[in-house]
Structures are given as structure tokens and as C-alpha cells.
Amino acid sequence: MRLNLLSRRIDFSNLFLAVLAAVTMLSGCSKFDNSQSALNGPQITAKFFDAQFTDAAGKPVNLAALRGKTVVINFWSTWCPPCVEEMPMFSEAQTAYKDKNVVFVGIAADQADNVKAFLQKTPVNYLIAVGGQPAFELSKALGNRHDAIPYTVMINAKEGVTSRHFGIYTRKDLEADLAKALK
């Protein structure tokens, strides 16, 4: 009888630990909520506008000049197939939303030589900045708690974060998030 009771306690302990682990994992996967996020205001977006990056040719990129616009920031790399897959859609959206004061910025977490060679084969019509490791640091500051790419952040004209997106964008999700950013 005593062995049976001990066995039940061990089973209960294992069940409790399993439930605790599941709750912890699920809470980490919650959807971004603008209303309660500490990663939303100008103090956070200032990190983007103040960042110092260059383009693939080594010329400084003036991100501060984008203040007052709706900015779609996509963190990517040349070695990331999902990143490369969504680039034509971003080029099309840059053209479609240009007159609505929307600017797309791709920040490559890569080396300048790799980005330069990539862009010669796969040109885009939006701003590309080369960030290397500091690109990952900026993406973390903008809410990328998974340190994953592609990762996209939208900042509205009032410098508030309106959406964060992990993984590849669908056209439908991109348009929905742009509509929200332009309100």
C-alpha cells in the first residue's frame, strides 16, 4: 500500500511538471499585443532611427530621415530561404504603397560582400542596410525574443510599433498589418 501511494505521488509530480512546462511554453508564444507591450513607443523605435548601418557599397544609411513615415523593417540574411522568398512581395508592396508614405527597409544580418553579391543577382526596389551582428541586437531591441529571421516590424508615422511578425509574411497578413499601421 505504501509503495502504491509513493507511486501516485511520483505520477502526480510528473503530471504537475508537465503541465507547468506546457503553460510556460504557451505563454512564451503569445501573440503580440500593442496595448500591453513595453516594446511599443518612441523610446523603443528611437533605437531603429538612431542605428548606424551602411548599404552594400559601404555608404552610411540615414535611418533618421525615415521619421514621420510608416516604416516596414525586415531583418533578413542572404542564407535564409524564407527571407529571400518574401523579398519580391516586399518590392511589390514598396511600389504599391509608395504614395502612402510607406518605406520598406531590409536590414541584413550578414556581411557586406555577401549582400552586395546577392543584390546583384536579386535586386530589390527598397532600402537595404547591412547590419551584421548589430542587426540581431537591433531586432532584439525591437522585440525579436527568438533571435530568428525573417523578422518584420512595422512602425507607424507616430513612431509606434503596430505589428511584429516572425517568419515569412503572406500577402494577406502584410496588407492587414499595413492597413493597421496606416490608421
Identify the residue ranges that each predicted region occupies.
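N-terminal targeting signals for export/organelle localization
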Residues: 1-50, 54, 163, 179, ...
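Short active-site neighborhood of thiol/selenol oxidoreductases, capturing the structured segment around
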Residues: 62-81
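Active-site-proximal beta-strand/loop segments in catalytic clefts of secreted hydrolases
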Residues: 75-76, 107-110, 131-132, 168
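Surface-exposed loop and edge beta-strand positions of immunoglobulin-like domains
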Residues: 54, 64, 105-107, 166
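Active-site acidic short loop of glycosyltransferases
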Residues: 66-69, 99, 125
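Structural microenvironment flanking redox-active thiols in thiol-disulfide oxidoreductases
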Residues: 84-123, 133-139
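Thiol/disulfide oxidoreductase modules built on the thioredoxin-like
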Residues: 120-124, 131-179
